[in-house]
Amino acid sequence: MSRQNLEEIIQTGIADTELSTEISTAIKRPRKYKVLLLNDDYTPMDFVVEVLKHFFHLNEEVAIQVMLQVHFQGKGVCGVFTRDIAETKVALVNEYARMNQHPLLSSMEPE
């Protein structure tokens, strides 16, 4: 390999590094969404805690705090996720509540 070829490879490598730096700074983080549980007058509190523990992996203490927030304030934040994950969690929670004959509703909103 000649010195000229080596210099070309080095220059190309530097140019590629500069290009990848420019590209990576243009990429934005995905928007986050809050997944909410909405209060109703019929869903038992223990079912809400079960949902929070099962679908959002909250421990008992935190699940109870969120459940009380839902109960007293009308809604509570279960977690913050990217759009796809938030949509999936909302769908799973709503389906699980329907399967168990509870009117509990979950929704999502941008953070």
UniProtKB/Swiss-Prot annotation:
Coiled coil: none
Function: Involved in the modulation of the specificity of the ClpAP-mediated ATP-dependent protein degradation.
Protein name according to UniProt: ATP-dependent Clp protease adapter protein ClpS
Subunit architecture: Binds to the N-terminal domain of the chaperone ClpA.
Pfam family, one: ClpS
PANTHER family assigned: ATP-DEPENDENT CLP PROTEASE ADAPTER PROTEIN CLPS, ATP-DEPENDENT CLP PROTEASE ADAPTER PROTEIN CLPS1, CHLOROPLASTIC
GO BP terms: protein catabolic process; proteolysis
Highest classification ranks of the organism: Bacteria, Pseudomonadati, Pseudomonadota, Gammaproteobacteria, Legionellales
Domain of life where this protein originates: Bacteria
InterPro entries noted in UniProt: ClpS (IPR022935), ClpS_core (IPR003769), Ribosomal_bL12_C/ClpS-like (IPR014719)
Gene name, Swiss-Prot/TrEMBL: clpS
Annotated family: Belongs to the ClpS family.
